[in-house]
Amino acid sequence: AVAVDKYTALCEEAISNLALKSATRKTNLIYRVELKTLTSDLMEHRGHGGFFYEYSLKNWEELFSVVTEKFQTVTCFGVDKEAFCEAVVAARLRGIDRIVPVGKAMDIGVFWDGHDLVRELSRIVKAN
């Protein structure tokens, strides 16, 4: 069912998404959709089960112009993560909480999407 869903999503994108540049798939496991441009409706396009959207940035500002509070984790490849993090902080972007390598977006730790999970999921009982 997931393979059919991915193929259906690819066909729908080919029909309706003017920003679509190309699509690649070697098997039904992974579909890669390359975008020509980043658009303001970027967060409405979500891949599932091995359906990925890709875009090669020319500069940070290109991404920053479409970032909203709905962004949480940005996966990247071939960039200096520290420089990118500094640029995110300098631009005062609300929405990018984690910058991780491709393949690490679902790794969870004590801090997740800008939240200290231990603190937020803990309860303190105090007796006076």
How does the language model describe each region?
Residues 78:
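A C-terminal functional module that forms or caps the active site or interfaces directly
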Residues 1-72, 85-94, 99-126:
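NAD(P)-dependent aldehyde/semialdehyde dehydrogenase
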